[in-house]
């Protein structure tokens, strides 16, 4: 788990953004994952009211051909942003997702799979700026997913400064 967490340190060090990283996994059984994590997210938000964004990281369950692209350093997992629309206020999550998607394509053209909207909640009703990010898929190697993180970290930092400056 530290190996997955470590690439996120530049978000704090290089970009000056504080990062709260919750590393527990709640995906078994899969059909109860969001229900199981919901009280944890509520608690984190209650204990940290200064949080500007909540990001839920996953790997997608689709084929490698869809989730992979090649950059100079090798294959990387592509990024998909998922927004749930079955709750009031989902539009603020979509606004954040649109900004992040633009920054991803600026930082690393071709790395984004875009934004998908589903009639779900994904616990995104718990915070006004909450998004689900799929990095690669179940057929991608850990190394491919880790190669994505610096690009995503830069895009998230750029998104943070652009989105919250323009919405203040």
Where are these regions (language model features)?
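Active-site-adjacent substrate-binding region
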Residues: 89-116
């Amino acid at each position: 788990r530290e190996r997955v967490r470590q690439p996120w340190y530049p978000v704090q060090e290089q970009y000056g953004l504080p990062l709260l990283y919750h590393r527990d996994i709640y995906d078994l059984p899969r059909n109860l994952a969001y229900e199981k994590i919901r009280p944890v997210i509520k608690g984190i938000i209650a204990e940290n009211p200064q949080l500007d964004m909540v990001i839920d990281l996953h790997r997608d369950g689709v084929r490698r051909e869809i989730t992979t692209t090649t950059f100079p350093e090798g294959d990387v997992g592509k990024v998909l942003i998922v927004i749930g629309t079955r709750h009031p206020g989902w539009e603020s999550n979509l606004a954040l997702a649109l900004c992040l998607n633009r920054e991803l394509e600026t930082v690393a053209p071709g790395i984004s799979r875009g934004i998908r909207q589903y009639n779900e909640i994904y616990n995104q009703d718990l915070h006004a700026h909450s998004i689900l990010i799929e990095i690669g898929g179940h057929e991608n190697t850990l190394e491919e997913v880790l190669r994505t993180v610096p690009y995503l970290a830069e895009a998230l930092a750029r998104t943070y400064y652009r989105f919250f400056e323009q919405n203040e």
